């Protein structure tokens, strides 16, 4: 991971941080350990997901699938009272601005409590104006459909 020159430099330096001490990490690595207990369950989940991705065609297929999922979601919300913030669209997430004095954070709460659907709330000054919808992971077009149907019900109940 590091060349010999980098390792020599690391060994001659003193870490100013308890959590980012490369020298300590290298010593632990020599004995096959990590400096702190890793998040084992997350590593297991990541390993499982990577195996699924490889079994279904690899990274290119997964990237294309995510792009299609993002496009599908964006198409489905066109007739809702929202605006897609498109200054820099990413396939991984869609930022959605609510219109007509609707409250984005309230939408987040209703989706979670009444529908069991999680979206990403925004914070700060934009808390009540913007929410984000992720497209990464083991999501499907059916998940998009379910989310958009729930959003339609929420907006209809507001009127």
Range-by-range predicted roles:
Residues 56-65, 79-87, 122-124, 159:
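Flexible, glycine/charged-enriched surface loops at secondary-structure junctions
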Residues 82-114:
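Conserved PLP-binding catalytic core of the aspartate aminotransferase-like
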Residues 112-119, 152-158:
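A common structural junction motif
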Residues 125, 129-159:
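PLP-dependent enzyme catalytic core of the Aspartate aminotransferase-like
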Residues 2, 96-100, 135:
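Short beta-strand-to-loop capping motifs
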Residues 1-75:
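Active-site C-terminal subdomain of aminotransferase-like
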Residues 70, 88-94, 124-132:
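Small/polar glycine-rich anion-binding or flexible loop at a beta-alpha turn
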């Amino acid at each position: 991971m590091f060349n010999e020159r980098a390792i020599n430099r690391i060994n001659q330096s003193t870490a100013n941080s308890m959590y980012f001490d490369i020298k300590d990490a290298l010593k632990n690595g020599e004995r096959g350990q990590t400096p702190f207990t890793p998040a084992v369950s997350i590593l297991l989940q990541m390993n499982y997901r990577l195996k699924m991705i490889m079994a279904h065609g690899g990274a290119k297929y997964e990237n294309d699938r995510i792009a299609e999922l993002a496009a599908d979601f964006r198409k489905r919300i066109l007739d809702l009272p929202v605006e897609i913030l498109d200054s820099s669209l990413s396939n991984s997430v869609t930022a959605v601005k609510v219109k007509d004095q609707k409250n984005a954070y309230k939408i987040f709460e209703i989706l979670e409590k009444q529908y069991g659907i999680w979206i990403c709330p925004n914070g700060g000054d934009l808390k009540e104006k913007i929410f984000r919808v992720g497209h990464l992971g083991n999501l499907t077009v059916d998940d998009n459909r379910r989310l958009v149907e729930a959003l339609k019900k929420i907006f209809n109940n507001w009127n």
